[in-house]
Amino acid sequence: MQTPKFRLFAGPNASGKTYVFKKLRKGNLIPKEIYVNADKIEAELEKKRKFYFNSYRVRTNEEEFRSYVLRSGLFREKINDENFPDQFSVRSGVLKVRKDVQVNSYHASFVATYLAEKLFESRQSFAFETVMSHPSKLEFLRIARNVGYKTYLYFIFTDDLNTNLARVQLRVSDGGHAVSPEHTLARAPRTFKLLPRAFALADSAFVIDNSNEARLVLKKENSILYRAERIPAILRKELASIVRSFSGTVREISN
């Protein structure tokens, strides 16, 4: 049986994670795997009030989903309302949100992370997109390795967070989802801080500067670390930490 693959696409809001994923897939650099994106799930829940777990070839039921929500760290830290799970129902693999409920990012986050758990159970290859501003997102890489997946990290960033803020505004003007400047700026340092740990957990890892045209600045593959000559200042500290702690061969990549 072929080894399943888990790909984590991480980075600050509006760094271009979905763009890089689509570019890699279009170039046949990664296969056409399931892509779990909480933003797209939120949009689907807002529009249809439904999410079709059964279209992902996973089995679920309402009791199991409720139990997952109640034991999650997100529920304990951000919600802690025992009536919150009543906003959902699950029948025949289809999740529905009550009509009187205003869908938000928490609803989408529960669906996305639960779907990831079920995909691991069914040993399907898939990719997951996250800002990775909380240590809990590192658990995906740990779980994947523990259950026999080959793991990949794609960390996408820009060299100036003002670029991210401008992209959010452009996305909203095109009908996309909004993220407040305060949230974008507050999350980014936490995301950067977690990069060395995520890099170490992944079997293969790629750090991509997506300020303009996507540019690879650090890569780990086959126990060799490749680093670019030009390292953006915004991530210099974290990337230096990765290089110092790497025990294998380090080589330069020119770009």
Predicted regions and their residues:
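Phosphate-binding P-loop
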Residues: 1-4, 118-120
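Short hydrophobic/aromatic beta-strand immediately N-terminal to the Walker A/P-loop
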Residues: 6-8
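The conserved Walker
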Residues: 12-13
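Walker A/P-loop
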Residues: 18
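The feature captures the helix immediately C-terminal to the Walker
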Residues: 21-22
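Conserved substrate/cofactor phosphate-moiety recognition/catalytic segment
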Residues: 25-121
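A glycine- and Lys/Arg-enriched "phosphate-lid" helix/loop adjacent to the NTP-binding pocket
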Residues: 146-194
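NTP-dependent small-molecule kinase module
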Residues: 199-255
